[in-house]
């Protein structure tokens, strides 16, 4: 099984709802099976209380707001960038109403805003994601927004590979700075990965948090709030993983192994798909 799959399994076991539920189950087991009743009760109550808190809109939105570190991009100001890069966030495989794969809600938010940025700036577009994600993004941009991506990166599995493989493609056309489009909570991690890959970026966050008035409903758990908490904590785990990796591995060495020497820019043409470089496997 690929390392990527094991990493996703581990993250899902830590994140809500699974993490707090496992904590509560462990506490219940200690209470019933062993004599450590006090510790078991504390763990069980702590797991259930954590799950309740993370499912409330007030807590969820505080976590999301903390994860979003960049304001909305002002498209009226000139941007010193050479391309727009849109990152995938999931896909609906074989969506029956489209007759093919289609972007999920997260990816569609990014694609919609990426199209707006591309139109406002006139910059060429690169879409980056897995095989189905990249294809769905390309088709959506063409069908729904009349924009044909110049580059398609369709081999990445995570944000790090988004950055490494996109950097390798962009370097062939001499692109060193991009407008980076992704979800607001994901932007910090995405920018760090692109910086490590040798690409400077202007943040163009999509789906920014907006202030809400809750009243008592803000303290009542709901599935949407739990999902927002999960996404915010997922990004916190991703940033922690990035920091640990940077401490263990030289980012300069990683860049040199992946990004090829810059080549003269190619003329405008149909979207091109590139195979991933073979020199540096993902961590």
Task: Tell where the protein language model's regions lie, with residue ranges.
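Membrane-embedded alpha-helical segments of integral membrane proteins
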Residues: 1-31
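Hydrophobic alpha-helical segments of integral membrane proteins
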Residues: 2-10, 59, 63-67, 233-240
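Lipid-exposed faces of alpha-helical membrane segments in multi-pass integral membrane proteins
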Residues: 19-26, 43-53, 233, 237
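Membrane-interface helix-boundary motifs at transmembrane edges
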Residues: 32-40
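A structural signal for short, hydrophobic/glycine-enriched beta-strand patches
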Residues: 48, 53-225, 229, 248
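Structured C-terminal subdomain patch of bacterial secreted/periplasmic proteins
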Residues: 224-253
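Compositionally biased, proline/threonine/alanine/serine-rich low-complexity intrinsically disordered stretches
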Residues: 253-283
